[in-house]
């Protein structure tokens, strides 16, 4: 993979170079010392992935991510001194289009095979699989849907998701009568913090989905592990390692397919901004079962990958700008409740 480094600290750049050199198939394409340079380099010499620091002079990592995604979209991995100390900026960068985040390896660890360089390499490998993926979704068997459970809104998001989710959730009323379950492509290390972060922007309670959780009307559950979230035929949430070959964990396709075959009430599917194709086939499975499905439009998507794939295969009942998705959900659920 051709990799661009954006970091103003020489020691950090050297540490990243040494970690990248551990893999023969990776090479450093260029190094930028601030966000402005990074944007110019991405336009002139597009990399496969950018390793983006957060704190830099002139233009910081969040602003640089936003500008790159507007001018020369590519995969961006936030690599910063301490992810845990910069969670707000990390979520903001992910909302702008970054795919994931990891701590910067130290120079000493960069010479070894300790966890720090391996964590970075694992993230790069994961992004590589996503870029190469032509994922096919597996539809688990389940009984024919019947009535008896509340309306469920199943939402999938990836790059740009945190900002899109914030906008969608804050537009829903406190008495929203449906259950909401979200699968956002995010490492489990950030899931609890993201649930708390989203909880601060909505009138609905946002919690992580645990093994055995049950979707409830007026509440939001967020997938919280690196395994796949699924609904059982009894409407109970759980996690599974299978299928193992999916490029992103948790997989939106796996969850949407389980909703299509396992949820016994009415359901709506929403596929938001994101890179790749995850969620498109699952959304189509939901639509085939009679669910109303929505894909975010190109103009309001930070990364028009997943919703584009859904639109291309006819998976979406409607393709909407972000600010129209919440009103449409409210209207559709009101219509369903009158039936």
From Swiss-Prot:
Which reaction equation describes what this protein catalyses? Answer: [protein]-L-glutamate 5-O-methyl ester + H2O = L-glutamyl-[protein] + methanol + H(+); L-glutaminyl-[protein] + H2O = L-glutamyl-[protein] + NH4(+)
- Domain of life of the native organism: Bacteria
This chain's protein is named Protein-glutamate methylesterase/protein-glutamine glutaminase 3
- What CDD domains does this protein's entry cite? CheB_Rec, REC_CheB-like
| GO-annotated molecular function | phosphorelay response regulator activity; protein-glutamate methylesterase activity; protein-glutamine glutaminase activity
Q: Which family does it belong to?
A: Belongs to the CheB family.
Residue intervals of the Response regulatory domain: 2-119
Please report the stretch or stretches of sequence annotated as the CheB-type methylesterase domain.
141-336
Q: Where in the cell is it found?
A: Cytoplasm
Q: What is its main location?
A: cytoplasm
Coiled-coil regions, chain positions: none
Protein EC: 3.1.1.61, 3.5.1.44
Positions of the catalytic residues: 158, 185, 278
GO CC annotation: cytoplasm
> What GO biological process, any one, is recorded here?
chemotaxis
What Pfam family does this protein match (any one)?
CheB_methylest
Q: What is known of its domains?
A: Contains a C-terminal catalytic domain, and an N-terminal region which modulates catalytic activity.
Modifications the protein undergoes after translation, according to the UniProt entry: Phosphorylated by CheA. Phosphorylation of the N-terminal regulatory domain activates the methylesterase activity.
* Keyword entries, A-Z: Chemotaxis, Cytoplasm, Hydrolase, Phosphoprotein
InterPro entries for the chain: CheB-like, CheB_C, CheY-like_superfamily, Sig_transdc_resp-reg_Me-estase, Sig_transdc_resp-reg_receiver
Top enzyme class of this protein? hydrolase
The keyword 4Fe-4S appears for this protein: no
This molecule's function is given as:
Involved in chemotaxis. Part of a chemotaxis signal transduction system that modulates chemotaxis in response to various stimuli. Catalyzes the demethylation of specific methylglutamate residues introduced into the chemoreceptors (methyl-accepting chemotaxis proteins or MCP) by CheR. Also mediates the irreversible deamidation of specific glutamine residues to glutamic acid.
Q: What gene name does this entry carry?
A: cheB3
Question: Is Calcium there in the keyword field?
Answer: no
Task: Name positions with the PTM 4-aspartylphosphate.
Answer: 53
């Amino acid at each position: 993979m051709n990799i661009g480094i954006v970091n103003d600290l020489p020691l950090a750049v050297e540490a990243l170079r040494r970690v990248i050199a551990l893999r023969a198939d990776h090479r450093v394409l260029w190094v930028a010392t601030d966000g402005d340079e990074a944007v110019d380099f991405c336009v002139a010499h597009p990399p496969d992935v950018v390793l983006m620091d957060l704190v830099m002079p002139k233009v910081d990592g969040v602003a640089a991510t936003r500008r790159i995604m507007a001018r020369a979209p590519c995969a961006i991995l936030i690599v910063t001194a301490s992810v845990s100390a910069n969670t707000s900026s990390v979520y903001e960068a992910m909302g702008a289009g970054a795919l994931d985040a990891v701590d910067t390896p130290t120079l000493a660890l960069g010479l070894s095979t300790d966890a720090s360089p391996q964590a970075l390499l694992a993230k790069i490998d994961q992004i590589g699989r996503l870029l190469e993926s032509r994922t096919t979704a597996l539809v688990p068997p389940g009984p024919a849907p019947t009535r008896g459970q509340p309306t469920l809104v199943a939402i999938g998001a990836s790059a740009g998701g945190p900002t899109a989710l914030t906008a969608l959730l804050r537009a829903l009323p406190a008495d929203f009568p449906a259950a909401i379950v979200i699968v956002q492509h995010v490492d489990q290390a950030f899931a609890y913090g993201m649930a708390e972060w989203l909880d601060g922007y909505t009138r609905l309670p946002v919690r992580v989905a645990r093994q055995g959780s049950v979707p409830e009307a007026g509440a939001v559950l967020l997938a919280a592990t690196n395994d796949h979230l699924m609904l059982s035929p009894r409407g109970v949430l759980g996690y599974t390692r299978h299928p193992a070959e999916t490029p992103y964990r948790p997989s939106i396709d796996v969850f949407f397919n389980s909703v299509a075959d396992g949820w016994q009430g009415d359901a709506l599917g929403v596929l938001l901004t994101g890179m790749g194709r995850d969620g498109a086939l699952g959304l189509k499975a939901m639509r085939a079962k009679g669910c109303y499905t929505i894909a975010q439009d190109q103009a309001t998507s930070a990364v028009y990958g997943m919703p584009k794939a859904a639109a291309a295969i006819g998976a979406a009942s409607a393709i909407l700008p972000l600010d129209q998705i919440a009103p449409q959900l409210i209207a559709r659920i009101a219509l369903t409740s009158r039936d």
